Structure formats: structure tokens, C-alpha cells
């Protein structure tokens, strides 16, 4: 990390006055948990996000199916919901990077595990650490100040998009396809995705 990034990251760290968020982002992920191939075909792993911005008059939503090729690169575990949910904030930052540069962002997540990993900046699991690193590298590149908090699942508007249920344009919503950086470091096996 170069000196410029360090200086910027501490800028305003001692400001005690509350600051209004420029952008509020909700993220979520879904992963079929019964382990059956048929279920994954009907309800594939997905991520969803919702952005509310002072600069954008309409709420913005996005979703994306998480490809099996990406999931296969993660450490094996019975259920990959944590990794899927961790991918959602990365996709939100990347997709909406033009709105987020040098902004104060409130990120609301309904997964306690993902919230904790992002706040701590690490995890005992190597693949979780890797995605956490991608998230914070991206936040640093965008010079975004992020406050992360938990939102109850029932109060998370990104729950619908993470299951393929989008709000309609006639309800005032704008829909954009979520995407993630083409190059995400992958130290396990030195692969790039």
C-alpha cells in the first residue's frame, strides 16, 4: 500500500460530527442448501444488490447468477452461501463504481458472518480472506469511506433480487446487471477469474 492511500484512508478519521451517507447499498446472496443438482438448476446461486443514492433519483437494483466455474474455485464446503453473500458487496462496488468514487457509503448486509469478515478484514478461511481483500482493495481504489452494518433479512430489499425477483420499472426502479472485476486475485492455484 503506498503512502497516498494511507494518508487518504486516515483523512477525516477523527471527525466526530455525524456524516450523512451519500449512498446506501443493501446486498444479499442465495444458495440452494439441499445439495441437489435439480435445485441448483431451478434456483441457481445468485447475488442481489440495491443502491439508494442522493445523486440518482430512482432506486437501483441488480442481480447476477453466480457461475459454477467460480464456485468450483472456492474451498470445498457443504454450503457456499457465505462466499456467495461475500461476492455481492464486491459486485455492488464494481457495478456502481461510477456513483461511489470518493463517497461515504453505508453498506447493509444480512449475513453476520460476511459483516464480521468485512469489518475485521480477514477470516480463518483462505478463500474468504481473498474476497475480503478484493473488497477492500476496490474500496481503496475508489476512495470510498464505508460503514458496514447488519440489516435483518426481512428488512433487506436486496433479498428479492438475490432470488431473481426484481422490482418493476413502473414502481420507479432502475435495473442494472451486476458484475464483478474481471481480474480478482486467486492465490489458490494462481488462477485468475
Predicted features and spans:
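Amphipathic alpha-helical
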Residues: 1-17, 23
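A short, polar/acidic, helix/strand-boundary loop motif
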Residues: 51-87, 113, 122
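Two-metal-ion RNase H-like nuclease active-site motif
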Residues: 21-41
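Beta-sheet entry/capping signal
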Residues: 21-24, 46-48, 57, 103-106, ...
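C-terminal, well-structured subdomains that either form a transmembrane helix-short loop-helix hairpin
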Residues: 25-28, 78-79, 83-96, 107-109, ...
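C-terminal functional segments of enzyme domains
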Residues: 141-193
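RNase H catalytic domain
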Residues: 94-163
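Conserved, non-catalytic sequence blocks in retroelement Pol enzymes and Pol-derived host proteins
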Residues: 16, 39-40, 76-81, 120-128
Amino acid at each position: 500500500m503506498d503512502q497516498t492511500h494511507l494518508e487518504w484512508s486516515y483523512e477525516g478519521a477523527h471527525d466526530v460530527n455525524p456524516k450523512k451517507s451519500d449512498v446506501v447499498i443493501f446486498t444479499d446472496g442465495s444458495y440452494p442448501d439441499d445439495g441437489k443438482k435439480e435445485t441448483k438448476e431451478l434456483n441457481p446461486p445468485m447475488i442481489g444488490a440495491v443502491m439508494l443514492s442522493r445523486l440518482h433519483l430512482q432506486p437501483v437494483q441488480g442481480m447476477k447468477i453466480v457461475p459454477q466455474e467460480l464456485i468450483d474455485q472456492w474451498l470445498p464446503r457443504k454450503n457456499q452461501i457465505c462466499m456467495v453473500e461475500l461476492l455481492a458487496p464486491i459486485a455492488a462496488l464494481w457495478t456502481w463504481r461510477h456513483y461511489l468514487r470518493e463517497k461515504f457509503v453505508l453498506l447493509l448486509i444480512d449475513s453476520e458472518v460476511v459483516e464480521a469478515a468485512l469489518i475485521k478484514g480477514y477470516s480463518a478461511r483462505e478463500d474468504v480472506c481473498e474476497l475480503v481483500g478484493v473488497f477492500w482493495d476496490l474500496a481503496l481504489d475508489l476512495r470510498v469511506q464505508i460503514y458496514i452494518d447488519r440489516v435483518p433479512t426481512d428488512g433487506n430489499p436486496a433479498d428479492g433480487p438475490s432470488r431473481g425477483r426484481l422490482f418493476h420499472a413502473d414502481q420507479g426502479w432502475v435495473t442494472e446487471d451486476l458484475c464483478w472485476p474481471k481480474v480478482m486475485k486467486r492465490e489458490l492455484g494462481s488462477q485468475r477469474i
